[in-house]
């Protein structure tokens, strides 16, 4: 089987001359086809749907000042929470417990889905069967 491209011209059924480029010519000489489209420019640059008007653009100095103000506000909130008795370690413990709860809930929902599939019913029916609320 010959894998090289033939440079011989061929005639199609409509008697049009067709030629296949060889080797390097395949990359450079091949005709690129533009896909037909009802839109005007098919090969135009990507244009984001989110347009930022010129008036909304903030200078770097204004952005830094805004961020510093936000940091001061957050520092004040942290200080207030510490005065109220909240500790970072306690917050981290609560976050870890929430992650564990979410993992257990995901496993439970997965099991309910499998049981529903085996029984040929919906998980909604199983929630009522096991005495669970739909928003649990």
UniProtKB/Swiss-Prot annotation:
UniProt entry keywords in alphabetical sequence: Coiled coil, DNA damage, DNA repair, Nucleus
InterPro entries with a match to the protein in the record: DNA-repair_Swi5 (IPR010760)
Disulphide connectivity of cysteines: none
Polar residues: bias regions: 1-17
Coiled-coil parts of chain: 61-92
This protein's record includes keyword Nucleotide-binding: no
Cellular component aspect of the GO annotation: nucleus; Swi5-Sfr1 complex; Swi5-Swi2 complex
Keyword Coiled coil: yes
Region (Disordered), start-end ranges: 1-43
Subcellular location: Nucleus
Similarity comment: Belongs to the SWI5/SAE3 family.
Name used for this protein in its record: DNA repair protein SWI5 homolog
Lineage, top ranks: Eukaryota, Metazoa, Chordata, Craniata, Vertebrata
UniProt gene name: swi5
